[in-house]
Regions:
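The feature captures two recurrent sequence modes
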Residues: 1-163, 241-243, 257-279
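Short runs of predominantly hydrophobic/aromatic residues within well-ordered alpha helices
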Residues: 96-100, 150-153, 168, 190-194, ...
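Short, hydrophobic/amphipathic alpha-helical patches that form generic packing surfaces
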Residues: 101-105, 155-158, 173-177, 192-202
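Residue-level signal for secondary-structure boundary elements
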Residues: 111, 115, 165, 180-187, ...
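Generic structural "secondary-structure junction" signal
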Residues: 159, 177, 202-205, 213-214, ...
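A structural motif
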Residues: 163-171
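Extended, Lys/Arg-enriched charged tracts that mediate electrostatic binding to polyanionic substrates
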Residues: 177, 181-213
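A recognition module on extended beta-rich or small alphabeta surfaces enriched in W/G with H and D/E
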Residues: 216-278
Length: 279
């Protein structure tokens, strides 16, 4: 979530988990380095559909098929309903313009086509305007199980269905607004909140744990791992989440947080950010 200028040293307690992880790696994948947007990206109907090679569509089909073998019994109702509402194709890479139109019909969100991981200010600005930044390239066949940077499968299949849920959609806009006001140690705190909700969140439904985080629903390994006995679960608590700085972004998660409802997510986030003067 951070892309500091090369001549700026970030205090240790203000570094993001991604910055820390990159410092510990010998070779940094250039896809994990955020890019600054040069002007407004294409939005909605202005997004052109790429001329994908058939291999990319086949990769998409493999990814969707693998996940859909597991998700119906593990993902939350809002996610599964979101997939239906967006009519996400299983046999070919969807059109961002079409997804944007359907998303707009559901909750007033649209899609912005971005080149990859983008600078945090650009990212937060788009969220604050109810515009979801999405790539349009799909990972290579050699990265079916894991890709260090977001691709269109993670963005479309992982994130977009949840943006059809009204409370989650409102929360994500609030997140963008609060993040634009964050300074110092509040920046990595917000990154942790994002990580343990948007990316790796769980929710309790009908007495059972269900998945909604994009980092889980788009990962074949995380889907089974997240609901296994190998993971320590905590009740949703914003104060606990924002101070949890011992997680690793490039490994399976061994601790997760469980919501009781998406209304709880909105209320908890609004209360914490208001106390911090971010909203």
């Amino acid at each position: 979530m951070s892309n500091n200028a090369a001549d700026t040293t970030t205090p240790e307690d203000e570094r993001s988990a991604f910055e820390t992880a990159q410092e510990e790696q010998d070779d940094v994948d250039p896809r994990t380095i955020p890019q600054k947007l040069d002007g407004e990206p294409p939005i909605g109907e202005d997004i052109e559909y790429p001329d994908y090679p058939e291999e990319d569509h086949e990769t998409w089909r493999i990814l969707v098929e693998r996940q859909m073998e597991q998700l119906p019994s593990r993902a939350c109702e809002a996610y599964m309903k979101g997939q239906e509402a967006l009519q996400i194709e299983a046999d070919r890479i969807p059109s961002l313009a079409n997804l944007s139109r359907r998303l707009d019909d559901q909750t007033g969100w649209t899609v912005a086509n971005v080149p990859g991981l983008i600078h945090e200010k650009d990212f937060f600005t788009l969220l604050s305007e109810r515009k979801f930044p999405s790539t349009n390239y799909v990972r290579g066949r050699e990265e079916l199980d894991y890709t260090p940077a977001p691709d269109c499968f993670h963005d479309m299949f992982g994130h977009m269905p949840m943006l059809t849920q009204p409370d989650f959609a409102d929360f994500y806009q609030l997140f963008g607004q609060a993040a634009l006001n964050a300074e110092g140690a509040d920046r990595p705190r917000l990154e942790r909140f994002h990580w343990f909700t948007v990316e790796f969140g769980l929710i309790r439904e009908h007495g059972e744990k269900r998945i909604f985080g994009a980092g889980i629903v788009s990962s074949n390994e995380e889907v089974t791992h997240a609901l296994s006995d190998d993971v320590t679960l905590h009740a949703f608590d914003p104060e606990h989440i924002v101070e949890k700085d011992d997680y690793e972004v490039y490994n399976l998660q061994d601790e997760l947080f469980v919501l009781d409802s998406f209304e709880q997510l909105v209320e908890g986030f609004r209360n914490w950010t208001t106390q911090r003067g971010l909203l």
